[in-house]
């Protein structure tokens, strides 16, 4: 288990960005998974800025998103597809066939989830997975009590997020919203993981993730058992650790 603590947000974003860039440079055919959210947006944009200044080969890289909101338009600003496309894919010029996402709309989400994880496997599996950390320890849409052996699936999102999305999209109450996500089993199959967390609001869950027991109460605690996982933190997020 490797823990990297950065001094400030600039160093945090730069370190994370170079983890992604280094993977692409070392293996141009890499399969790289990305997560959306407040923690990762700036580091994605930084990857794009560095690429714009110093172009390198990206046309054989496959990117995919860890999760997606269901039953909203794909063009919705809060859809993971739109966020990743805006933050990085457009800047890198990644073609749609090399940008894999779970669908926002599907007639059969169970089949769509199976197809998604199979396509990742067909491309050789996950070389690098960048994970964010929820304040309750969730990974993607794998909330507390999600099974450690679970594969890609659709689960309910938390109430606060669901209410915000309904307001922003005008989705009526009778239309169910969910979160399609790779399961924890899929996550643990990644050859390399970098979990990123910053800010004092993450300090408590970081401590529980790294120093507490491995438990479904804190889904991210399973990463203690991954053979090649780096925990990239800023000083605020690491402030409660004993190490």
Specify the residue positions occupied by each region the protein language model found:
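Glycine-rich N-terminal segment of FAD-binding domains in flavoprotein oxidoreductases
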Residues: 26-52
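N-terminal glycine-/serine-/threonine-rich phosphate-binding loop
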Residues: 1-32
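Short beta-strand segments
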Residues: 33-37, 65, 102-103, 130-133, ...
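ATP/nucleoside-binding phosphotransfer catalytic cores, i.e., glycine-rich phosphate-binding loops
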Residues: 182-185, 189-243
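Short glycine-rich anion-binding loops that position phosphate/pyrophosphate groups of nucleotides
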Residues: 38-39, 69, 133-138, 144, ...
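Class I SAM-dependent methyltransferase SAM-binding "motif I" and its flanking Rossmann-like core
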Residues: 136, 140-184
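A glycine- and small-aliphatic-rich helix-loop capping segment at beta-alpha/alpha-beta transitions
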Residues: 46-57, 80-82, 144-153, 212-214
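Ligand-binding beta-strand-loop-alpha-helix segment within the catalytic cores
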Residues: 56-128
């Amino acid at each position: 288990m490797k823990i990297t603590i950065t001094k400030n947000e600039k160093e945090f974003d730069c370190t994370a960005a170079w983890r992604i860039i280094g993977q692409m440079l070392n293996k141009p055919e890499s399969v790289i998974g990305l997560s959306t959210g407040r923690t990762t947006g700036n580091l994605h944009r930084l990857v794009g800025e560095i690429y714009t200044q110093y172009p390198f080969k990206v046309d054989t890289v496959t990117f995919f998103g860890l999760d997606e909101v269901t039953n909203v338009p794909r063009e919705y600003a809060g859809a993971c597809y739109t966020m990743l496309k805006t933050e990085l894919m457009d800047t890198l010029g990644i073609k749609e066939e090399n940008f894999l996402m779970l669908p926002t709309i599907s007639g059969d989400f169970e089949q769509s989830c199976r197809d998604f994880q199979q396509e990742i496997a067909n491309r050789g599996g996950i070389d690098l997975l960048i994970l964010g950390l929820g304040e309750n320890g969730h990974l993607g849409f794998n909330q507390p009590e999600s099974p450690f052996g679970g594969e890609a699936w659709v689960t309910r999102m938390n109430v606060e997020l669901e209410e915000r999305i309904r307001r922003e999209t005008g989705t009526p109450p009778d239309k169910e919203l969910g979160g399609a996500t790779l399961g924890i089993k899929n996550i643990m199959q990644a050859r390399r993981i970098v979990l990123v967390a910053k800010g004092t609001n993450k300090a408590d869950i970081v401590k529980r993730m790294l120093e507490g027991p491995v438990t479904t109460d804190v889904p991210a605690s399973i990463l203690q058992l991954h053979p090649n996982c780096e925990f990239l933190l800023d000083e605020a997020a690491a402030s409660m650790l004993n190490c």
